Each structure stands twice: as C-alpha cells, then as structure tokens.
C-alpha cells in the first residue's frame, strides 16, 4: 500500500434526530493509520475525557479508520457545524460537517 496523507471521504452533510443519540461519521483513508483524530465544535476541541454529552468510537480498517462522534440526547444546540481533523506522519486533512436535524431540511 502506498503511504499518503489522510483523505476524508465522509459527506459534508449528515443527519440526526433531536432527543436521540446522533452519530457523526468521519471516514478516513490513511496509510499509515492516523496518529490523531480531533473533533471540533464552536472553534473548541471536544474534550472526551470530561464530557458526558460527547463520546466517540473508532473502527480500524486496513487502509484507514472510521471515527464516529456520538452525541447523547441531541438538542437543538447540537445541530450545526463540526470539524473532523485527521493527522498522520504524512500530513493532515479536515472536513467541515454540517449536522442537520431530521425534518428540518
């Protein structure tokens, strides 16, 4: 496999329902695997260590990862812009993802 900077292939618009757990997906092709995946909301890095509202999971693939941000009991203020930033030893990529409330399109 060729090594290269990370490349995010997720869509820039994702959807979720108010009151439920909403998942925002950051699908990344990255060889070597990412050293870091960072989620940003309102210009601040989401601190998973201190947050009960946000968590994440990561599924490793041979050529990258799928990193999913989980938002517990999503409220009106949770919809809007998120940023997924991915770093590996070859470079960086980022994607602005707009989370849209289902039924509000």
Where are these regions (language model features)?
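Immunoglobulin-superfamily
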Residues: 1-105
């Amino acid at each position: 496999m060729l090594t290269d900077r990370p490349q995010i292939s997720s869509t820039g618009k994702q959807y979720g329902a108010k009151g439920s757990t909403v998942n925002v997906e950051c699908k990344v092709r990255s060889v070597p695997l990412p050293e870091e995946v960072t989620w940003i909301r309102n210009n601040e890095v989401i601190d998973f260590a201190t947050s009960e509202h946000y968590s994440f999971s990561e599924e490793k693939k041979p050529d990258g990862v799928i990193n999913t941000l989980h938002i517990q009991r999503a409220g009106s203020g949770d919809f809007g812009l998120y940023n997924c930033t991915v770093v590996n030893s070859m470079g960086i990529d980022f994607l602005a993802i707009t989370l849209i409330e289902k039924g509000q399109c």
